[in-house]
Amino acid sequence: SVNALKVIAIANQKGGVAKTTTTHNLGVALAAARKKVLLIDLDSQASLTISVGLEPLEMQHTIVDVLKKDGAPVSECIQQLRDNLHIVTSIIDLAPLEMEMLSRASREKILDRALKPVKENYDFILIDCPPQLSILTINALSCADGVLIPVKTDYLAYRGLTQLQDSIREIQE
């Protein structure tokens, strides 16, 4: 049921398929419907952060602060955008964070553990994933109740979709 979909990862290993646009517009629409929404920008291009009108270089607390070893509580990194709509922003370069995450135990559950304390505060948590199957995407898929996969309508996109579905099944087992 839709009510069971609290955490939704918007993912596709291809770039340019409207992951960020989908995340942003779905978040705004749900907030307008009086649902409390948290957006998470996991993309190292910080596209979601930029699309909501924020400047990644000016952010004091970002997803990096949440996911790094001995990181800050996610509650300290949430910014309100408008009524019912909040965001955890990203920065332009997440490569050092990804390298650090890869060296940790239970590395695929880092985001899940970080979000636990705030999950009950939101009706929906929407995660904008990077355009590759990185440790960040694996974290998003591990904590998601569902995955929204935007695709272009062509054969190569369809082939990529089946590969992503296989990866999702593997991660969730």
Labelled PLM ranges:
Residues 1-173:
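P-loop NTP-binding core
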